[in-house]
Regions:
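Beta-strand-rich interaction surfaces with strong enrichment in secreted/lumenal proteins
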Residues: 16, 59, 101-103
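HotDog/MaoC-like acyl-thioester-processing domains
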Residues: 7, 36-37, 106-109, 116-161
Length: 161
């Protein structure tokens, strides 16, 4: 199979099967490209109806940098769910490095994040993310993740002892 054939797309329902986040903290609407063990590209359509715009900032709404980082981390978390043996594990980010913001993200923007897997060792992973609106660079960061067992799986395992 060549690289082009391995590109996948995920809709919101498929993303919600992978990530535990829900509104208002689910910050990825769709995955437009996913190449297992390589990268994922995710999209967040930013609307004026986002709850954070009520206070950040009235009359001059911009997406908080912490939520831009969270959107990048969520795309990175999806990328780490492939290969198949990682499915069902919860991607928890354990660190951020080299965080850079270049220009604000505003209502009406379509925030596109590319998350490139740099390293996976056991259940630990490192992902480099960059996000854009159109051709305009918005932010980048390196994320460290741990792929954790879900709490309900731990409880099941303990009950089966």
């Amino acid at each position: 199979m060549n690289r082009r054939e391995s590109i996948m797309e995920l809709n919101i329902e498929e993303i919600m099967e992978i990530l535990p986040h829900r509104f208002p903290m689910l910050l990825v609407d769709k995955i437009t490209e996913l190449v297992p063990m390589d990268y994922a590209v995710g999209v967040k359509s930013v609307t004026i109806n986002e709850p954070f715009f009520q206070g950040h900032f009235p009359g001059h709404p911009i997406m908080p940098g912490a939520l831009i980082c969270e959107a990048m981390a969520q795309v990175g978390g999806v990328a780490l769910q492939y290969p198949e043996e990682n499915r069902g594990l919860i991607p928890m980010f354990t660190g951020m490095d080299k965080v850079r913001f270049r220009s604000p993200v505003r209502p009406g923007d379509q925030l596109v994040t590319k998350a490139v897997i740099k390293k996976i060792v056991g259940r630990m992973g490192k992902v480099h993310c960059e996000c854009y609106v159109g051709e305009t660079f918005k932010a980048s960061a390196d994320f460290l993740f741990y792929l954790a067992e879900p709490e309900n799986k731990k409880e099941k395992d303990e009950n089966n002892k």
